[in-house]
Each structure stands twice: as C-alpha cells, then as structure tokens.
Amino acid sequence: MDKLDANVSSNEGFRSVEKVVLLTFLAVVILMAILGNLLVMVAVCRDRQLRKIKTNYFIVSLAFADLLVSVLVMPFGAIELVQDIWAYGEMFCLVRTSLDVLLTTASIFHLCCISLDRYYAICCQPLVYRNKMTPLRIALMLGGCWVLPMFISFLPIMQGWNNIGIVDVIEKRKFSHNSNSTWCVFMVNKPYAITCSVVAFYIPFLLMVLAYYRIYVTAKEHAQQIQMLQRAGATSESRPQPADQHSTHRMRTETKAAKTLCVIMGCFCFCWAPFFVTNIVDPFIDYTVPEQVWTAFLWLGYINSGLNPFLYAFLNKSFRRAFLIILCCDDERYKRPPILGQTVPCSTTTINGSTHVLRDTVECGGQWESRCHLTATSPLVAAQPSDT
C-alpha cells in the first residue's frame, strides 16, 4: 500500500513539474508575441520614414492580427492545456474557435497582400505601381483581409456547418480525458475542411510562391543588366559612374527586402503548413490523428504570431533602427541624420536619352554629406525602396 501511494505521489510530482515547464514555455511564447507585435506597431506609428512605405501598412495590420491572437486566443488555450479542462462554456468555446480561424486566415491574407505589393513595386514600372497601389486600393485590400475570413470562421462555426455529420465524434472527443471534464473541441467535416484549408492557406500560398518567383527572376535579370553596365563603364573609364553605383545599391536594397519577406512567408508556412495539411487529411482517415499531434501543430502555428517582429528586427535595417530608438528611449545615436547646410543644385546627366538626378545623404569619414547621384531607368531600381 505504501509503495502504491509512493508511486501515485511520484506521478503527481512529475505531472506538476510538467505543468510548470509547459506553463513557462507558453507564457514566454505569449509574452513574446504581445511585446513583439506591439513594438512593430509603435515603431511604424512613430517613425515617419516607415509610414511612407506602403508595404508597412500591411505589416502593421498583420502585427495587429498577431497581437489579437496572443491576447484573445492563446491565453485560453494555455489555460486549457495546463488545467486539462475547458471551464468557460460552450458558447465562449465557439467564439474562441471562430477568432482563432479568423485571425489565422487574416494573417496569411496579409502576407499574400504584402507579396503582391512587392511584386508590383519590383516587377512593374513605377507608374504601374503607383496606379495599382493607390490609397483606396490599399484600404480595400486591408478590409478584405479582415472581412473575407469571417465567411469561413464566425459564419459557419456559429451555424454549426463544420460539425454536420460528426456530432457524435465531437461529443466523444469532448469527454475523452475523464468523465468530469470537458475540452473545447474543434473538429470539421470533409466539406468544411477542404473549403477552409483551400481558401485560408493553399490559394494564398500559391499566389505568394508565384509572386516571389517573379521577384526572384526580376532581381536576377537586373543584376545581370547592372553587371553589364559596370563592365561597359570599366572599359570606358577607370572610375565607376555614380549611376552604376546607385543602381547597384537600389537593386540590392530591393532584393534584400524581397528576401526578408520571403523569410517571413517561409516561417509562416513552416509554422502553419503542418496544421493545414493535418486539417485536410484527418477527416479522410476517420479522425485518427492523436490529440497531442493536433495540439503541437496548433501551437507551432501560434508561435508564428511572435516570430514576425523578430524577423523584422534582424533582417530589416529600418525596423531595427526604429526598435532601438524605442527601446533606448530616443537615443540620438540611432536617429536618422538630417540634411544640414545649403543644398547645391545637382548637375544633370543624360543616359540613353533619359535624364535622372538624385540627391542622397551619405556617411563619409564619420560626417554626413549630401551628394548627387544619377539614377538608372529600371523597374527594380525605381520601385519603392525598403531599407534593409
């Protein structure tokens, strides 16, 4: 009898340690998501240069969606995991599930819009980009990112369309742990699984892959063009022309920006693809996927909500500078230098019948100087820059 009591006590102690470790991990994930996404939103609101970049409107809206996930969805899921019971009633379970689907879908829609914005900026002429990405169109795209997901979240879930034909399976799953506790179980039938997964993940993912492929091809073509210009300049003059130097810089800037967004998209797909693949497969194998696998894949997706801000900090120079200014209490070292002194008119130069002049601020020997640069006619170079 004493041996049995000792085993029971040992198991309870092990479970207590497990719960402490699990709670600590989930708390770190939630806190990281809240603080990181708040930092992104504050950075864009305070930094005038970040507000001028149209892509950042989508990034702020994406950060807001991730912030809502970390505040309205993740804490209740963490409490359910630690306490091994859902104590908030069936109606709030439906609301929480609807918010989960809504915000997850909104996140990937935002990433799709960001990829389309970068496609028009890098692969099209500047005039085409300005005509395509007008303030009205940006507002409509942002509205669509929030409104369209409601048709696969609140509407079908509140109406119970997702559980038609599988109510008995759901009831068994709710009480599978013990007779005195229930879980907030979200299971879907075959029609809803296919519709939700295709709309929320597979179609946007395909659009993003196509957009970034075209960006990669365009960047490669312009890299070859600039290399040819540099070789031609080297044969005629020993010193590289400002046009070639600035064109190369702008091309590299846009290419790095595209790579940054590709990394963000890749991390999103890595985090959410296992869930969406399982979501579409499970109904066709009689719901035999273990609950532990579902939970692991779901929280892998939640981790993405706290991952994007750190990707911006490490891969984007403008965001990194804005973060440092906020965290270091407006330290003057991290602020952009103003252009001081009187400006001298820049001389114009004609290349292939087109005249282009640009004044820029550069660092030279620890001092900031205003200089003139010649810009090349290129859809990649002329696209709206993302400072990386």
UniProtKB/Swiss-Prot annotation:
Task: Report residues binding serotonin.
Answer: 100, 279
Q: What is its main location?
A: membrane
Query: Which terms are listed as keywords in the entry?
Result: Cell membrane, Disulfide bond, Endosome, G-protein coupled receptor, Glycoprotein, Membrane, Receptor, Transducer, Transmembrane, Transmembrane helix
What membrane topology does the annotation report for this chain? Multi-pass membrane protein
GO terms assigned for molecular function = G protein-coupled serotonin receptor activity; serotonin receptor activity
Which residue stretches are annotated as topological domain Extracellular?
1-19, 79-92, 158-188, 284-290
Which Gene Ontology cellular component annotation is one that this UniProt entry carries? postsynapse
- Keyword Cell membrane carried by entry: yes
Residue positions with a glycan: 7
Membrane spanning segments where?
A: 20-44, 55-78, 93-117, 134-157, 189-212, 258-283, 291-314
Q: Where in the cell is it found?
A: Cell membrane; Endosome membrane
Q: Which segments does the entry list as coiled coil? A: none
Q: Which residues lie on this side of the membrane: Cytoplasmic?
A: 45-54, 118-133, 213-257, 315-388
Family note = Belongs to the G-protein coupled receptor 1 family.
**Function of this protein?**
G-protein coupled receptor for 5-hydroxytryptamine (serotonin), a biogenic hormone that functions as a neurotransmitter, a hormone and a mitogen. Ligand binding causes a conformation change that triggers signaling via guanine nucleotide-binding proteins (G proteins) and modulates the activity of downstream effectors. HTR4 is coupled to G(s) G alpha proteins and mediates activation of adenylate cyclase activity.
Instruction: List, alphabetically, the PANTHER family matched.
Output: ADRENERGIC RECEPTOR-RELATED G-PROTEIN COUPLED RECEPTOR, OCTOPAMINE RECEPTOR BETA-3R
Q: How does it assemble?
A: Interacts (via C-terminus 330-346 AA) with GRK5; this interaction is promoted by 5-HT (serotonin).
Q: What is known of its domains?
A: Specificity for G(s) G alpha proteins is determined by the length of transmembrane regions 5 and 6 (TM5 and TM6).
State the protein's name. Answer: 5-hydroxytryptamine receptor 4
Say which species the protein is native to.
Mus musculus (Mouse)
Lineage start: Eukaryota, Metazoa, Chordata, Craniata, Vertebrata
Q: Which gene name does the record give?
A: Htr4
